[in-house]
């Protein structure tokens, strides 16, 4: 229909009636015009461009517009909380958090776990898989700048008959 998600639009509709008997006339109802608000099933996202992207298999460094730039997703519709895992394969990963796949609004370091649209690069301690959590408006008041973030280093391993070390400790 070409309508924008979460924005009210106008739809015109009519019903077409037919039968299996080709000799019967096709009938159409009157056209009805009414407002609708479409929704999307796609979760809101935040992108994580940085100096680690190319070395980690995500495309170009510092390129939020790159379709391979990693992103994290909202935990549910209407939430300002986002989470996801990002692999960073450089000794000193630096990055920003963008609201879209561009640099128009990019969160940087606002000091101890806080985000600021005018802040410098965010960083983590070294290479690895990080569980990144962001809340763009934890107090629910868009008039306050209280956006926050955290990154937790994670360690993953698989064991079982399908792995080279079988059921033994993977370390």
Kindly give the residue locations of the regions a language model identified.
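Insoluble glucan recognition modules
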Residues: 1-171
């Amino acid at each position: 229909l070409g309508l924008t998600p979460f924005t009210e639009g106008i739809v015109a509709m009519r019903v077409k009636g037919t039968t299996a008997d080709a000799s019967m006339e096709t009938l159409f109802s009157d056209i009805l015009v009414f407002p609708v608000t479409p929704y999307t099933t796609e979760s809101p996202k935040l992108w994580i461009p940085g100096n680690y992207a190319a070395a980690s298999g995500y495309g170009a460094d510092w390129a939020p517009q790159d379709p391979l730039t990693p992103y994290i997703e909202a935990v549910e519709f209407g939430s300002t909380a986002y989470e996801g895992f990002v692999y960073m394969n450089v000794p000193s990963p630096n990055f920003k958090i963008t609201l879209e796949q561009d640099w128009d609004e990019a969160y940087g370091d606002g000091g101890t776990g806080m985000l600021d649209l005018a802040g410098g690069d965010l960083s983590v301690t070294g290479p690895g898989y990080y569980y990144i959590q962001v809340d763009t408006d934890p107090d629910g008041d868009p008039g306050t700048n209280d956006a926050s973030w955290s990154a937790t280093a994670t360690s993953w391993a698989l064991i079982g008959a399908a792995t080279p070390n079988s059921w033994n400790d993977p370390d």
